[in-house]
Swiss-Prot record:
GO terms for cellular component: cytoplasm. The keyword Transmembrane does not apply. Residues 119-142 are annotated as: Disordered. It comes from Drosophila pseudoobscura pseudoobscura. This is Protein charybde. One of its GO terms (biological process) is regulation of TOR signaling. Belongs to the DDIT4 family. PANTHER family: DNA-DAMAGE-INDUCIBLE TRANSCRIPT 4 PROTEIN DDIT4, PROTEIN CHARYBDE-RELATED. Inhibits cell growth by regulating the Tor pathway upstream of the Tsc1-Tsc2 complex and downstream of Akt1. Acts as a cell death activator during head development. Keywords: Apoptosis, Cytoplasm, Developmental protein. Gene3D superfamilies: RTP801-like. It holds the Pfam family RTP801_C. The lineage of its organism: Eukaryota, Metazoa, Ecdysozoa, Arthropoda, Hexapoda.
């Protein structure tokens, strides 16, 4: 009789998830060895209990999932492993600790952080080195970077560039009054400084530098129409051993270039705009052999 009760009890336990088989005392009835079928049913109950803890506790799966999620969010913070000196790489624990005890927003932030970290550690995805860093945005570019590396003035003296730039401005003002039939001459803001820096570079290997230079300034108003408007020695007390020919070009990209010449003469539109492009040619007055 006890065997049948245990069999029914095991069936109920397997259906509703009770994982502990209670002893059903029976007065006056000796306990007998369990039947092999009963042992299989007990093992099946234990396996089900181990696989599905929700059924054992009597709670639905959603409740246990909520508890597991709460327990995951209340875990203690995993200490960040210090990065290896000089490696510049972040450890896996440090990269993912925000996901362990972060909110929903923190989870997405940490996810993107881990994605970026993984792409940084594997830029080429196993196919060689990754691409070089992208250049700075236009908002971060400097004035020198707009014209390229050749116009970077870090390799020349700032005071020498300033002095030579002032000489160029003085000569251009004088040339406007004497040789250019116009009311105004507009120059790009950094044109004279870039010209001065290039003159210093081209004079770097000369015995006396730019002080032994005679500079000729020419103006090109039309293609194949070049005229000389100024010339001067950088240092009047130094003998010139080489010459530099500077050619400035008229910038005709403005709307005033479309006006007829007689209208320019009648209005204040008679303005010459100098292009930011120029040419500089060197002529040595001595033999280098």
């Amino acid at each position: 009789m006890k065997m049948e009760v245990l069999s029914v009890q095991n069936h109920i336990q397997g259906k509703f998830g009770v994982n502990k088989i209670k002893d059903w005392p029976s007065s006056g009835v000796a306990s007998t060895a369990p039947h092999p079928l009963e042992e299989e049913e007990e093992n099946a109950v234990d396996v089900n209990a181990a696989l599905d803890a929700d059924v054992v506790d009597g709670h639905p799966a959603s409740v246990l999932h909520m508890r597991q999620h709460q327990a995951l969010n209340t875990r203690s913070t995993v200490p960040m492993a210090p990065p290896v000196a000089g490696s510049g790489k972040q450890s896996a624990v440090a990269a993912s600790f925000d996901v362990v005890n972060g909110s929903s927003a923190a989870y997405h932030h940490a996810y993107m952080t881990n994605v970026l970290a993984s792409t940084a550690h594997h830029p080429g995805h196993g196919h060689g080195p990754g691409p070089s860093p992208m250049p700075a945005s236009p908002l971060q570019s400097t004035a020198g970077a707009r014209f390229g590396a050749a116009d970077n003035m870090d390799d020349v003296s700032a005071s020498a560039v300033r002095d030579l730039s002032q000489q160029l401005q003085f000569q251009l003002r004088d040339a406007k009054q004497r040789h250019l039939a116009c009311t105004e001459v507009n120059l790009p803001a950094d044109l004279t400084e870039r010209i001065a820096a290039e003159i210093i570079r081209m004079s770097d290997r000369e015995p006396c530098g730019e002080r032994a230079c005679t500079l000729f300034i020419e103006f090109e108003s039309e293609p194949n129409n070049v005229r000389r408007i100024a010339s001067f020695k950088v240092d009047p007390d130094t003998v010139s051993i080489f010459e530099l020919y500077l050619t400035l070009k008229q910038d005709k990209s403005g709307w005033t270039s479309l006006l007829p010449q007689f209208i320019k003469n009648l209005t204040r539109s008679n303005t010459i705009n100098i292009s930011p492009d120029f040419t500089l040619t060197k002529n040595k007055l001595y033999s280098s052999e």
